[in-house]
Each structure stands twice: as structure tokens, then as C-alpha cells.
Amino acid sequence: YKRCHKKGGHCFPKTVICLPPSSDFGKMDCRWKWKCCKKGSVNNA
């Protein structure tokens, strides 16, 4: 999210958010999402 990026950027690790299948294939719609970290919570890695 843009707000998250402004508040402190992205942090590792990534998390997978899966949504219910929206097609006839029946596959879960999984997308990589960055965990939101507060500013100064993690050193530059």
C-alpha cells in the first residue's frame, strides 16, 4: 500500500495473500504482499 510505503517502506519477508478462485479453473488467486513495517522498526538489510 502507498500509505505503508510512506510510513516506513516494505520489509521482509513477503507474505502470500490468497483470495477465493474467481475463475472456473478453481485455482486460488495468490499474490505476494510485503509486510508493512513501522519506520525504524528494521535496519537497512
UniProtKB/Swiss-Prot annotation:
Record localization: Secreted
Listed PROSITE patterns: MYOTOXINS_1, MYOTOXINS_2
Molecular function (Gene Ontology), one example: potassium channel regulator activity
Tissue expression summary: Expressed by the venom gland.
Presence of keyword Secreted: yes
GO BP annotations listed: envenomation resulting in occlusion of the pore of voltage-gated potassium channel in another organism
GO cellular component, one term: extracellular region
The UniProt record lists the keyword Disulfide bond: yes
Keywords: Antimicrobial, Disulfide bond, Ion channel impairing toxin, Myotoxin, Neurotoxin, Potassium channel impairing toxin, Secreted, Toxin, Voltage-gated potassium channel impairing toxin
Superkingdom: Eukaryota
Major localization class: secreted
Disulfide bonds: C4-C36, C11-C30, C18-C37
Matching Pfam families: Myotoxins
Protein family: Belongs to the crotamine-myotoxin family.
Subunit: Monomer.
Function field: Cationic peptide that possesses multiple functions. It acts as a cell-penetrating peptide (CPP), and as a potent voltage-gated potassium channel (Kv) inhibitor. It exhibits antimicrobial activities, hind limb paralysis, and severe muscle necrosis by a non-enzymatic mechanism.
Name of this chain's protein: Myotoxin-3
Species of origin: Crotalus viridis viridis (Prairie rattlesnake)
